[in-house]
């Protein structure tokens, strides 16, 4: 069913969330724009971004209020992921081969995959990797102390999640650089550092990155069928107690989801954490002065403030009224977690970074519902472990310049961040 495109909301004719130019603005300007959008009586409508992949569709509604993001998340029967959750335009079929993971599915297909995957994360495996996280964070800080001033992203925040997720899956160190490079390509947004500015070339780069990752997991899975190991690829490539297992295509697309999501989001949160703790020395002191009691609240505040994933898309399955707003079958909506996490109706003084903020019902891991972030527990452990090592061993570590931000509407990324610290 196609719905005729409504006219764009005239109240925001100077704001266009579909244009790269908007996402190149200074964060303060974007905050101000979203604050204006949240004042509107109804979710604003935007035309689809222009792309050579497809002809633009009928546009989408931007859910910018916390209540709307939460309501859409908890009603997956109305707000479906099946037409794609990570692209505002409907992608051509060849993308589904590598990126058709469970993030782009509804139940019962989504429930089946999530069940198989959840069972692969056994308590023993989780315990093993929790120990590895702390040990890896300590080794990274050892290297930082030996290196001195450096790019924090390259030397610290990118290293921890990359090593943990690769080792969890069973990928050897020789493949780490390839995995990082392909992750950067897949999540490049419109950033010319990682992706060609020629759109046809850029599409080829993204598909090649997906194909390379799929080939890697297929090769490792075949090896694990012969010689099993204590890793996730072995667990996912063999049947569980109910005789369920992932098909090779499901394994490849899940692997890409897990490695890409498990890499970029924690890296983004840690990079922004250093910026925030540099800009708010009072919050740094507060956290260091009672680290173990304050760190869990601080992690939630970092995830709220950063919102590593800016939005996800849903498609409306039937005519429905949600929070007083009429939606038609076929409508597209974008759930702007970044804006919901700054909603003045929910968070007092939302632009203030407060490590003691409570309550903190942020949607930085997605809203409640079946698509709540599968890796939230691991991400929290990684951020906690890295900040414990950094702040307790190198309490003066600080950013020395403005972050070099990723040009993307989807990931609130930092590409480079120079840092330094006082030598003891």
Language model segments and positions:
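Cytochrome P450
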Residues: 1-424
């Amino acid at each position: 069913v196609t719905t005729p495109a409504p006219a764009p909301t005239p109240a925001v004719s100077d704001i266009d969330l579909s244009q790269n130019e908007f996402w190149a603005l200074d964060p303060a300007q974007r905050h101000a724009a979203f604050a204006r959008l949240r004042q509107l009586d109804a979710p604003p409508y935007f035309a689809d971004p222009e792309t050579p992949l497809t002809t633009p569709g009928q546009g989408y509604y931007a859910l910018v209020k916390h209540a709307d993001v939460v309501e859409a998340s908890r009603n997956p029967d109305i707000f479906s992921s099946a037409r794609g959750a990570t692209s505002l335009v409907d992608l051509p079929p060849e993308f589904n081969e590598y990126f058709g993971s469970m993030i782009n599915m509804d139940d019962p297909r989504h429930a089946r995959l999530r069940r198989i995957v959840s069972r692969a994360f056994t308590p023993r495996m989780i315990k093993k990797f929790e120990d590895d996280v702390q040990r890896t964070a300590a080794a990274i800080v050892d290297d930082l102390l030996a290196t001195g001033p450096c790019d924090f992203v390259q030397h610290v925040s990118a290293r921890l999640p990359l090593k943990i997720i690769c080792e969890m899956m069973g990928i050897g160190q020789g493949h780490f650089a390839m995995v990082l490079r392909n992750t950067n390509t897949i999540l490049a947004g419109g950033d010319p550092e990682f992706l060609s500015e020629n759109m046809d070339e850029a599409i080829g780069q993204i598909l090649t990155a997906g194909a390379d990752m799929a080939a890697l997991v297929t090769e490792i899975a075949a090896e694990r069928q012969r010689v099993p190991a204590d890793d996730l690829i072995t667990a996912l490539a063999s049947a569980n107690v109910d005789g369920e297992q992932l098909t090779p295509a499901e394994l490849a697309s899940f692997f890409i989801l897990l490695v890409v999501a498990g890499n970029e989001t924690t890296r983004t949160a840690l990079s922004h954490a250093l910026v925030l703790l540099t800009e708010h020395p009072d919050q740094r002191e507060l956290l260091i002065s009672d680290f173990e009691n304050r760190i869990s609240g601080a992690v939630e505040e970092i995830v709220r403030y950063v919102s590593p994933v800016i939005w996800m898309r849903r498609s409306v399955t039937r005519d429905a009224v949600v929070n007083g707003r009429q939606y038609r079958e076929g409508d597209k909506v974008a759930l702007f977690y970044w804006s919901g996490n700054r909603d003045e109706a929910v968070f007092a003084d939302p632009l203030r970074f407060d490590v003691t903020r409570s309550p903190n019902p942020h949607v930085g891991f997605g809203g409640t519902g079946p698509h709540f972030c599968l890796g939230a527990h691991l991400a929290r452990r990684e951020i906690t472990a890295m900040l414990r090592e950094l702040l307790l061993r190198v309490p003066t570590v600080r950013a020395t310049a403005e972050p070099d931000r990723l040009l993307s509407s989807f990931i609130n990324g930092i590409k480079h961040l120079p840092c330094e610290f006082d030598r003891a």
